[in-house]
């Protein structure tokens, strides 16, 4: 699927009431990310969900910053994969309406909106309904997703309680799992929450 990939997550364009400062910080981060990816020989890129912050609407200045950033990513990688996080979805329990659907029209961008596996890599958007049942059955060595797993820190102080069906033990077939969603960088066994792209204060 790829030789070497650069990965980031949870950039949340449009945060702080569509703050121009925040969106500019996001764009500057994208420039830095591309530079680092080139320096480290990454021909592919992956974004692990929550591109936008607001689930209900998109501000035009935020949309403009988003398009500029995705066009940069599409033109600087052989392939750049993006999948939906919960903040990208209009409904939390289904993925039919989301704020990054337009990205599939940008050259170089591959939008993943369903469980996808190629070779030894799986790309998994925000899970809905009983899709969690696919995780224990998946044999991919590497899995990238936007998972809400118990006993990981939701922030610096509070751990996610046990609720829902998905558990850490369901990832028994994966050597490495990389996830967005929780903003604190942390690891338990084979599961890595890669943390914030930049500090959202």
Identify the role of each PLM range:
Residues 66, 84, 88-169, 194-197:
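Conserved catalytic scaffold of divalent metal-dependent phosphoesterases
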